[in-house]
């Protein structure tokens, strides 16, 4: 399954400037997802992080991975079954940042579903620029009614 930005804004509750997934290139719901965040110099966080040396904040890379994970969960259901659902980030474990992400990079977001208990899902997540791993984290997220 693939999703363009029009699909993504129907799935996620986020909006600019906090929508950090631009496209889904592969999604096997509840198994794995591969998505893209195009990093541009126009991102509002580059104004202060850092002037004259722009680097995407690590917490926003993790947020991108969490949003991709949420799409993996929410994208599996029909519009009617997921309409009143939201995915909340519960925890981030073992986050590692290996290389800076800068304007012009295409951030490839990979989230692999590991298991679920009740409404809590665990994902092993990786971010790449090209073939190079730039970040990784284990994410726990909870599906809730709103």
UniProtKB/Swiss-Prot annotation:
**Catalyzes what?**
a (3R)-hydroxyacyl-[ACP] = a (2E)-enoyl-[ACP] + H2O
Protein name, entry field: 3-hydroxyacyl-[acyl-carrier-protein] dehydratase FabZ
Record flagged with keyword Lipid biosynthesis = yes
NCBIfam families assigned: fabZ, PRK00006.1
Q: Set out the biological process GO terms recorded for this chain's protein.
A: fatty acid biosynthetic process; lipid A biosynthetic process
Q: Is Cytoplasm found in the keyword set?
A: yes
Active site, renumbered: 49
Q: State the EC number(s).
A: 4.2.1.59
List, alphabetically, the HAMAP family matched.
FabZ
- Catalytic class of the enzyme: lyase
Instruction: Show the InterPro entries listed in the entry.
Output: FabA_FabZ, FabZ, HotDog_dom_sf
Where are the bilayer-spanning segments? none
Which subcellular locations apply to this protein? Cytoplasm
Q: What does this protein do?
A: Involved in unsaturated fatty acids biosynthesis. Catalyzes the dehydration of short chain beta-hydroxyacyl-ACPs and long chain saturated and unsaturated beta-hydroxyacyl-ACPs.
Q: Give the keywords, sorted.
A: Cytoplasm, Lipid A biosynthesis, Lipid biosynthesis, Lipid metabolism, Lyase
- Annotated Gene Ontology MF terms? (3R)-hydroxyacyl-[acyl-carrier-protein] dehydratase activity
- Family assignment from sequence similarity: Belongs to the thioester dehydratase family. FabZ subfamily.
What are the GO cellular component annotations? cytoplasm; membrane
